[in-house]
Amino acid sequence: MKKIFFTAISLIFILSAQAQDATHDKGVIINGVKWATRNVDAVGTFAATPESAGKFYQWNRKTAWAAEGETVENWDSTYPEGTEWTAANDPSPAGWRVPTRKEQATLLDAAKVTKVWTTQNGVNGYKFTDKTTNNSLFLPAAGYRNDSDGTLSSAGSYGAYWSGTQDALGFYSGNADWNDYYHRDGFSVRAVAE
């Protein structure tokens, strides 16, 4: 009997670990959209925790840029082409993708989702909570990399998350909304389920 019990407990730990490793995420449904609980990190992986910045990406490019350190080398300051983020350039892990603006809009639907600037485990960001299910999603204010030279800016006070359609969800303590940014900027990516 003990052997069966320990085998069952071991299996639970293994399945739990697999559900939240670098390439797997259980996700959370907010206003009908299944969001990853962590930012995209290196191509095809998730950051370690919901508060981790992950990596920054330029719009419709698959090169990952560090979210730490003042400057980076070999920053690509050319303007990306296209009007939609292509699947070939999507840095998300398998089963996930860069969200559309319409999917990002579900987070800002005040009738169905509350948004609150907060600090979670010492990290500033926005917490979006589904009013029906009480599920919540934390987006860290990871800052961004400047379009002209890749200099890190506003970490801890500003967050920007690319959509697949040439704009981004940007926020600071007083507001969260869309803007049409320079596509050469390096922003976070929070994936949605395919």
Model regions and ranges:
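Bacterial Sec-dependent N-terminal signal peptides
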Residues: 1-21
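C-terminal, surface-exposed recognition/capping segments
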Residues: 22-194
